[in-house]
């Protein structure tokens, strides 16, 4: 699932492609991508609107229009796909060999911006304002923003009795972390993912804060170099494999102490950690 670094890389790559362009036409190929909204709402708000800015909030891509906005949420497998023109859109959308599962497409002044998801979990919504979007409006402090200070983070930790891993996944507390970077941050901070958030002392809290920022920044660099390939659904994961220290490394020796990385289940998700290093 794309997390903060991947979504930020998409935003930075999209800006020069779509910013300032007008949406000429909207194609909704699979209505499930806009539910519970109606396809007509998306079409009505977006058609003939100009994309003023491309921004990010947590794991959401925001296309700020001259009136209203569009939110793109990738969920597990959603991705942005770029087409040269309408002809390529329909050719690739209908191709069995090199096809993509396009749910929604926006024909722009130059090029076509598509939103694809083979599982149809991702969502594209139209809103008149940010406050109208319950998902975006409830998001907590962004993990790469200047507001995410060590002091702010410590206060959030102190107010929660949840296990650290579950706390980090709560987007209403800290926005942007998912399963991958929560595991990685806890490994770098040498903290047991099962510990209660409020149990961390001052030094441990600062260590985790530093690890989160460092892990996300390094991952973002990997996502941007080379630049995102909007034709490869797994572009974001390829470069990350070389920097991951815990995630998806069950049974492999810990890069610090040599003890095998373990996998446990927390909140229905896999957590990877070192039982010797992480206390």
Which stretches of residues belong to each language-model region?
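Basic, nucleic-acid-binding surfaces and adjacent catalytic neighborhoods in DNA/RNA-processing proteins
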Residues: 22-42, 55, 90, 154-279
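Short, contiguous clusters of charged residues that form electrostatic/catalytic patches at enzyme active sites
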Residues: 5, 9-12, 151, 155, ...
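Gly/Gly-Pro- and Ser/Thr-rich, intrinsically disordered tail segments characteristic of DNA damage-repair
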Residues: 1-124
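Phosphate/anion-contacting hairpin/loop surfaces
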Residues: 70-176, 181-188, 196
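Generic detection of long, well-ordered alpha-helical segments
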Residues: 1-4, 143, 147, 201-209
